[in-house]
UniProtKB/Swiss-Prot annotation:
Homodimer. One of its GO terms (cellular component) is cytoplasm. The active site is at C187, D194. Pathway: tRNA modification; tRNA-queuosine biosynthesis. Its main location: cytoplasm. It comes from Haemophilus ducreyi (strain 35000HP / ATCC 700724). This is NADPH-dependent 7-cyano-7-deazaguanine reductase. The lineage of its organism: Bacteria, Pseudomonadati, Pseudomonadota, Gammaproteobacteria, Pasteurellales. Substrate binds at I86, E87, S88, H226, E227. Its EC number is 1.7.1.13. NCBIfam families: QueF.
């Protein structure tokens, strides 16, 4: 069995598990980013120098000193330069273990979750916990940019193919932002569908929108984690379109109370922090 198979087979994802009511940071499981980056040929030198996996956690709860349950929404930012990504089911199980644990304050919960995730990721992690009264002001918004989804084209292939991007960037130099809501891939372990929207901001030769849309749709039967899909899209665009500047940002729908929104860029980019219609 290969190292990759050994790591993936050890994950709780896709396996029957028991839920615990006692705080247990050992429930968190790491997936080395190196596993997928080796396949992409970017382990030694990533084509991006900025990036993070931005999680929104909708099922965060604990007990205060009086035993009264508290509920909140957490935003977690995991640096893309961390050694590991966090496996999502293990994260859910970990948060469940916090439910019946007493903490002195919201700030203590923030600190403990941030510390535990940092150790698991072997890198920088930031955690911000919001009271529901704060988060209710989050408005539903959309990515800025031009949506490429309304093209009158026939699609007959849903197997991943980077070849759609061949000769996709020719002609004039532009700076533009393109958006698609048709991104769909499948979990690497369970093959459950992952639904997302993707924003691509670039400076370079104008990218053919039909070829780009066909490429994005080809992820429809592709099995890979959210973070890995975004790094694959980024790497493929750099390989075939060769833009001077590039940011790829995806926002996925939630599963199990968690949503993952990765972005990668090769310049000092600041992605929109928004809540989309499907989130």
């Amino acid at each position: 069995m290969s190292y990759t198979d050994t790591v993936l087979s050890s994950l709780k994802l896709g396996q029957k598990t028991e839920y615990t009511g006692e705080y247990d940071p050992t429930l968190l499981q790491a997936v080395p980013r190196k596993l997928n980056r080796d396949h992409l040929g970017i382990t030694e030198q990533q084509p991006f120098n900025q990036g993070a996996d931005v999680w929104t956690c909708y099922e965060v709860s604990w007990l205060n000193l009086n035993g009264l349950p508290q509920v909140a929404i957490a935003e977690v930012v995991i640096d893309a330069n961390s050694e590991n990504l966090i496996e999502s089911k293990s994260f859910k199980l970990y948060l469940n273990s916090v439910n019946q644990t007493t903490f002195e304050s919201l700030e203590q919960v923030e600190y403990i979750i941030e510390s535990d995730l940092s150790r698991c990721a072997c890198g920088l992690v930031w955690v911000k916990i919001h009271k529901l009264s704060e988060y209710k002001n989050e408005i539903i918004a959309d990515f800025s940019g031009e949506c490429i989804d309304e093209q009158d084209i026939e699609i007959d292939n849903y197997q991943y193919s980077a070849q759609y991007l061949e000769h996709s960037a020719e002609g004039e130099e532009v700076e533009e932002t393109l958006v698609s809501h048709l991104l769909k891939s499948n979990c690497l372990i369970t093959s459950q569908p992952d639904w997302g929207s993707v924003q691509i901001h670039y400076v370079g030769k104008k990218i053919n929108r039909e070829k780009l849309l066909r490429y994005l749709v080809s992820f429809r039967e592709h099995n890979e984690f959210h973070e890995q899909c975004v790094e694959r899209i980024f790497t493929d665009l750099m390989t075939f379109a060769k833009p001077e500047k590039l940011m790829v940002y995806a926002r996925y729908t939630r599963r199990g109370g968690l949503e993952i929104n990765p972005f990668r860029a090769n310049f000092d980019a600041m992605p929109q922090h928004i809540r989309m219609a499907r989130q």
